């Protein structure tokens, strides 16, 4: 597994950042190039070096040198289409996990790093825990959970759609350099898959799905007493239904609801101000804990309100399902999904090719 330190090797994802702060993340290949608006970065200039170095895009003189060294590429030069500017500098770093999540290929919409960080913190997800996740999507949350529990823990992920499971699996493999051994990725309906899991075997459950209130029975069966359930939802209607379902079940503690807003700042001398743009609402986090069997959660007495029903209470089950379909946030065209899967298959295949090349090089040296 890639330790993500030491010399940079082929197959890794690397982040190039210019003086203006513009970032480009690309997978390195022997003899490969990264196209930029300021010229070309030659991957051979990066492979074997350490993080923190600065590389310069190809100039006309360097391009002529590369052509002379590799005449077989004359008939198919990927840098022909690039503006021949050259001389632009980029800092070389391995991407942070937050950067990787935002740049990785997507089959479904992802959770923002600000929400993922709160899931890890509020869910008290740490090394050695056994975690159950529902809704892999593109793998953003999965990769962060894998990182949080570490090799001493274990993550089980349930994803309804096989194509999304493939995307999540490939993104995690690319991040770690190989498929994480402490991850069990299952496809199918949450209730059906969870029914085959041992009782009270999970310390934490993370739900990222449209109807988490319909999954509470199986979630309670597999979570350990005192375990934390945390759900990510995007609308107030979903949030209200989940909270009321948790209260009605009786064996979940009073739900805590949180929304995170993120704003960055600029500081230049004494000129300090917030950025004009910010990341506002992306979703709600609902957190609750499981009571032991036979014990009901303690509730405070709330003053009764006039509003005891909602518009959704008057809907038929079919109408409610139609509303869920309208809330579908993971919709993606088949064409785009096929393209994402092709790109990921190509990138993961490079990992095995580069690994074989390294082994052959070591054998030759011996």
What label would you give each PLM region?
Residues 1-94:
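N-terminal auxiliary segments of SAM/dcSAM-dependent transferases
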Residues 3-6, 10, 17-26, 30-32, ...:
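C-terminal lobe and adjacent flexible extensions of AdoMet/dcAdoMet transferase-like proteins
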Residues 123-125, 149, 222-223, 227:
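A generic alpha-to-beta junction signature in SAM-dependent methyltransferases
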Residues 126-137:
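Conserved class I S-adenosyl-L-methionine
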Residues 129, 153, 227:
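Glycine-centered, small-residue-biased loops immediately flanking beta-strands
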Residues 138-151, 220-221:
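Conserved SAM-binding loop of SAM-dependent methyltransferases across substrates and taxa
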Residues 158-212:
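S-adenosyl-L-methionine
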Residues 216-287, 292:
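C-terminal substrate-binding/active-site "lid" region of AdoMet-derived donor-dependent transferases
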């Amino acid at each position: 597994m890639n330790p993500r330190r030491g010399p940079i090797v082929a197959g890794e994802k690397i982040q190039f950042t210019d003086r203006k702060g513009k970032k480009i993340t690309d997978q390195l290949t022997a003899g490969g190039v990264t196209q930029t608006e300021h010229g070309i970065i030659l991957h051979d200039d990066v492979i074997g070096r350490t993080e923190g170095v600065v590389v310069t895009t190809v100039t006309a003189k360097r391009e002529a040198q590369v052509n002379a060294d590799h005449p077989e590429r004359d008939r198919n030069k990927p840098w022909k289409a690039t503006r021949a500017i050259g001389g632009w500098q980029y800092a070389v770093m391995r991407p942070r996990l937050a950067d990787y999540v935002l740049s990785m290929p997507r089959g479904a919409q992802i959770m923002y790093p600000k929400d993922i960080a709160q899931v890890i913190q509020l869910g008290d997800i740490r090394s050695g825990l056994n975690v159950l996740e529902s809704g892999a999507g593109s793998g953003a949350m999965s990769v962060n959970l894998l990182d949080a529990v570490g090799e001493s823990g274990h993550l089980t992920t349930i994803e309804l759609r096989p194509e999304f499971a493939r995307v999540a699996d490939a993104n995690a493999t690319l991040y770690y350099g190989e498929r994480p051994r402490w991850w069990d990725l299952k496809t199918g309906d949450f209730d059906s898959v969870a029914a085959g899991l041992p009782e009270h075997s999970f310390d934490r459950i993370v739900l990222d799905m449209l109807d988490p209130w319909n999954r509470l029975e199986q979630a309670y069966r597999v979570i350990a007493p005192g375990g934390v359930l945390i759900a990510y939802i995007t609308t107030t209607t979903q949030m209200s239904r989940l909270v009321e379902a948790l209260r009605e079940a009786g064996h979940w503690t009073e739900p805590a609801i949180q929304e995170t807003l993120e704003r960055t700042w600029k500081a230049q001398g004494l000129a300090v101000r917030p950025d004009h743009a910010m990341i506002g609402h992306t979703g709600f986090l609902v957190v609750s804990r499981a009571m032991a069997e036979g014990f009901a959660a303690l509730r405070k007495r709330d003053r009764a309100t006039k509003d005891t029903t909602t518009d959704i209470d008057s809907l038929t089950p079919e109408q409610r399902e139609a509303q869920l379909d309208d809330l579908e946030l993971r919709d993606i065209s088949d064409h785009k999904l096929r393209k994402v899967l092709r790109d990921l298959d190509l990138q993961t295949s490079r990992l095995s090719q580069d690994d074989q090349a390294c082994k052959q090089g070591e054998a030759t040296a011996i």
